[in-house]
Amino acid sequence: MFNVVLVAPEIPPNTGNVIRLCANTGAHLHLIEPLGFPLDDARMRRAGLDYHEYAQMRVHRDWDAFVAAETPDPARMFAFTTRGSGRFHDHAFLSGDWFVFGSETRGLPAELLERFPNEQRVRLPMRPDNRSLNLSNTVAVVVFEAWRQAGFEGGA
């Protein structure tokens, strides 16, 4: 299945929504510290309802600890960013891919984004005068498109 990586998320309900999404799609969730809230935050738990127990989630102290623990294939990692040049609809996603998202207010740090080749810095299409999409909405669009490409493997 797919892997969702949130780097330093700040808004508890967004993370709660992503937990619920991962529970319902089978995607694995990785949270990279620092987090902008405690994991027992009531707003996050409310947004995730009772799906926390069904989601596969791991917390990593920083990016390097994440890479060491998970050993993701760099060729199958995609950084989603408003500064991306790769076109979302040009990618053929595969089960096991890693989708990396930055925080709600800052996005991915430049030093992290630079580790991704240009074609793996992906931007979702949107109206030209708008800043960005909501983090949890963006994650949902990406995961469902990837899952669709995989034939909704494991879905009912």
Curated annotation (Swiss-Prot):
Q: Which CDD domains does this entry report, sorted A to Z? A: SpoU-like_TrmL
Coarse class of the primary localization is cytoplasm
- Under Enzyme Commission nomenclature, its number is 2.1.1.207
The record ties this protein, via InterPro entries, to: Alpha/beta_knot_MTases, SpoU_MeTrfase, TrmL, tRNA_m1G_MTases_N
* Protein location: Cytoplasm
Keywords from the named record: Cytoplasm, Methyltransferase, S-adenosyl-L-methionine, Transferase, tRNA processing
**GO molecular-function annotation terms?**
RNA binding; tRNA (5-carboxymethylaminomethyluridine(34)-2'-O)-methyltransferase activity; tRNA (cytidine(34)-2'-O)-methyltransferase activity
One protein family per Pfam: SpoU_methylase
Per its database record, what is this protein's job? Methylates the ribose at the nucleotide 34 wobble position in the two leucyl isoacceptors tRNA(Leu)(CmAA) and tRNA(Leu)(cmnm5UmAA). Catalyzes the methyl transfer from S-adenosyl-L-methionine to the 2'-OH of the wobble nucleotide.
This protein's assembly is summarised as:
Homodimer.
**Per its UniProt record, what NCBIfam families does this chain match?**
tRNA_yibK_trmL
Its name, as the record gives it, is tRNA (cytidine(34)-2'-O)-methyltransferase
Per the UniProt record, the source organism is: Burkholderia cenocepacia (strain HI2424)
Task: Print the organism lineage.
Answer: Bacteria, Pseudomonadati, Pseudomonadota, Betaproteobacteria, Burkholderiales
